[in-house]
């Protein structure tokens, strides 16, 4: 164990994870928004129209958190071209307008949500509720974990309570991602 080697915990991040095979049900609020989404005529598409989603994402992050995505539009497009089976874009459309979506990173047992965003109208219409119901209960049912990603900032010192509340509403439960620091000079060879 790391603690026996005097490893030091440097950060603890909280992620929200669903186990599609037998995860927790959506909250009452999420089910209500899902019902609304089903009656609003929204549709989901998986494509490579990253520019349509990126404008929603950038505006959302700027307005709500005064931040930009970790990746630029050019970077995510390039990554998608290099890894088309591992990086996928899902958009929620109202007619032809992008009102929500997410970028997924796919690996052996995990479907990880890297970016999530919706417009104000998309939020009102339940766009993300429709999207995550589809992703968790139809598209990624064979994955062991559906990971919504972390809900903390500053190395785990600040919990974004609104964000974790939303993720728990979709059935996500907390999983800790710990980072340790180990000085290799102090480790014995035996």
Regions found by a protein language model. Name each.
Residues 1-42, 148-190:
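Terminal substrate-recognition subdomain of acyl/acetyltransferases
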Residues 1-122:
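A conserved beta-strand-loop-helix scaffold within acyl/acetyltransferase catalytic domains
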Residues 86-186:
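Aromatic (often tryptophan-rich) hydrophobic motifs at membrane interfaces
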């Amino acid at each position: 164990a790391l603690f026996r080697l005097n490893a030091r915990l440097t950060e603890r991040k909280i992620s929200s994870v669903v186990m599609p095979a037998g995860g927790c049900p959506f909250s009452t609020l999420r089910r209500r928004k899902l019902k609304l989404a089903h009656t609003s005529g929204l549709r989901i598409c998986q494509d490579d129209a990253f520019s349509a989603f990126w404008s929603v994402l950038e505006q959302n992050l700027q307005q709500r958190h005064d931040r930009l995505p970790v990746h630029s539009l050019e970077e995510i497009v390039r990554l998608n071209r290099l890894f088309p089976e591992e990086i996928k874009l899902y958009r929620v459309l109202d007619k032809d307008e992008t009102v929500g979506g997410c970028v997924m990173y796919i690996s052996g047992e995990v479907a990880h949500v890297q970016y999530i965003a919706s417009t104000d109208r998309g939020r009102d219409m339940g766009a993300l509720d429709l999207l995550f119901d589809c992703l968790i209960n139809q598209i990624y049912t064979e994955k062991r974990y559906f990971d919504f990603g972390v809900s903390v900032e500053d190395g785990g010192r600040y919990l974004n309570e609104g964000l974790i509340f939303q993720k728990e509403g979709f059935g996500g439960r907390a999983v800790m991602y710990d980072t340790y620091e180990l000085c290799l000079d102090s480790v014995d060879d035996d």
